[in-house]
Amino acid sequence: MKIKILFLSDNYPPEVNAPASRTYEHIQHWVKNGAEVTVITCAPNFPQGKVFEGYKNKLFSKTLQDGVTVIRVWSYITANEGFVKRILDYVSYSLTSFFVGLFQGCDIIVATSPQFFTAVSGCLLAIFKRKPWIMEVRDLWPESIKAVSAMKSDSKVFVFLEWIERWLYKRAASIVVVTDTFKEKLVEWGVNADKIHIVK
């Protein structure tokens, strides 16, 4: 019987950034090995924040792309500028992907970050659907926000986001990171090293 994977990523081809390319490569590998994969993403718009020609920012659309069921959901699309606008983009995708994900059959859920709120959606889906979920960590968020001075580490918002992040790490059945440094950092934060896997 085929394993059914539900994958959440706000970047996916035809976008050509690193998250989209990495996600596509992983999914194609799984499909070739017999998995049935459904991706929930949004209308392609990176990096200009403008929907690509031939696509619309609709509430819901479903297509078959290279053997993968691709569901695109509505999100607040904006150029990659301004903290508040980006957060609106992230949160809107998290909400719509969660709602649509509730109606998708699966055996396992994978959610990739950045951005951080995709992982929130994946975790909540896992709780509601009683399925295991894997968190792929490509950036230590909200640490990355602090690194570019977009938010102070002693602010209430940062402390709250950091608490959510640690909660997500504990809830995930497995965590995939892209560097040895990321694994070391998570272990330092108290995450069980046995459930952290490095895939470069």
Regions found by a protein language model. Give the residues of each.
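A conserved catalytic-core segment of Leloir-type glycosyltransferases
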Residues: 39-101
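Donor nucleotide-sugar binding/catalytic pocket of nucleotide-sugar-dependent glycosyltransferases
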Residues: 41, 132, 154-200
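Membrane-proximal helix-turn-helix segments that form the acceptor-binding/catalytic region
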Residues: 98-99, 105, 117-120, 124-128, ...
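Histidine-centered beta-alpha loop that forms part of the nucleotide-sugar donor binding/catalytic region
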Residues: 10, 113-114, 137-140, 200
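Active-site proximal beta-strand in glycosyltransferases
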Residues: 5, 108, 126-145
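N-terminal subdomain of nucleotide-sugar transferases
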Residues: 1-66, 196
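Short N-terminal targeting/anchoring amphipathic segment
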Residues: 69-72, 97-118, 131-136
